[in-house]
């Protein structure tokens, strides 16, 4: 995943690109920041994360744990079909293929205008035992979030119904417990499979928001930092 011309990145320490880490990295690391291809802040670093994830998926499968995911939205286009099966074999990983075509059109429209769009990825972990995690800083939400935010362009995360829970009453948000065939489960999963930072045996679900790709063809404003122009 090489850059075709590293010269494209010359001068970014004094003329930072909007939406990129050029300015913040330049201030923090001074003359030691690597701007070629975005350096440590490049979206290319998604590639090794995918490799590591692929290995982890195989190890988890041996434990009876499955991780499934899908594109939940692109721009304003949302796939509201529940995530229940893997979309890994699809070239465009959505549950509803018709909605996927609309998402593709949304991407193409932004590209034609020299712009970009963001999106949301939804994940579910199936087969987790009860009792993983802990309170406070050992909670599953915190541990997962620290990893997810290591993915380039991630700007937000929510577990279960996330921020929507703030609009509900406790009686609406609470997940009732039932016992089926000797197994404790809940009739709903608003909590996303986590209570008190600890897994409860239900699918662990979360959604991660990705900002629009900052590298766009549209003209943008910035400043020449040395002359403050």
What are these regions (language model features)?
Residues 1-3, 224-226:
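Short, small-residue-biased leader/transition segments that mark boundaries at the very start
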Residues 4-24:
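Glycine-rich, N-terminal phosphate-binding loop and its surrounding beta-alpha-beta segment
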Residues 8-11, 69-71, 184-187:
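Short, well-ordered strand-loop elements centered on a beta-strand within folded domains, enriched
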Residues 12-15, 138-140, 223:
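Short intrinsically disordered coil segments
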Residues 17-27, 218, 223:
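Pore- and pathway-forming membrane helices of multi-pass small-molecule/ion transporters and channels
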Residues 21-24, 48-57, 104, 142-149, ...:
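Predominant activation on well-ordered alpha-helical scaffold segments within soluble catalytic domains
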Residues 27-136:
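Glycine-rich, mobile lid/loop segments that gate access to catalytic sites or pores
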Residues 114-219:
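Glycine-rich anion/phosphate-binding loop at the beta-strand->alpha-helix junction
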């Amino acid at each position: 995943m090489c850059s075709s011309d590293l010269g494209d990145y010359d001068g970014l320490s004094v003329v930072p690109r909007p939406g990129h880490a050029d300015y913040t990295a330049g201030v923090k690391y001074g003359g030691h920041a690597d701007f070629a291809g975005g350096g440590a802040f490049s979206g290319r670093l998604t590639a090794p994360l995918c490799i590591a994830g692929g290995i982890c998926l195989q190890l988890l499968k041996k434990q009876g744990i499955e991780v499934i995911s899908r594109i939940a939205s692109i721009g304003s286009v949302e796939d509201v079909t529940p995530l229940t099966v893997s979309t890994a074999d699809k070239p465009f990983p959505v549950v509803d293929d018709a909605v996927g075509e609309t998402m593709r059109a949304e991407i193409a429209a932004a590209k034609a205008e020299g712009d970009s769009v963001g999106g949301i990825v939804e994940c579910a972990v199936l087969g987790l035992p009860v009792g993983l995690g802990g309170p406070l800083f050992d909670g599953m939400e915190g541990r997962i979030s620290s990893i997810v935010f290591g993915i380039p362009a991630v700007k937000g995360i929510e577990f279960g119904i996330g921020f929507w829970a703030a609009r509900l009453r406790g009686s609406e948000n609470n997940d009732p417990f039932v016992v089926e065939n000797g197994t404790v489960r809940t009739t709903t999963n608003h909590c996303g499979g986590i209570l008190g930072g600890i897994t409860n045996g239900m699918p662990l679900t979360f959604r991660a928001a990705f900002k629009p790709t900052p590298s766009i063809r549209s003209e943008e404003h910035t400043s020449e930092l040395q002359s403050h122009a």
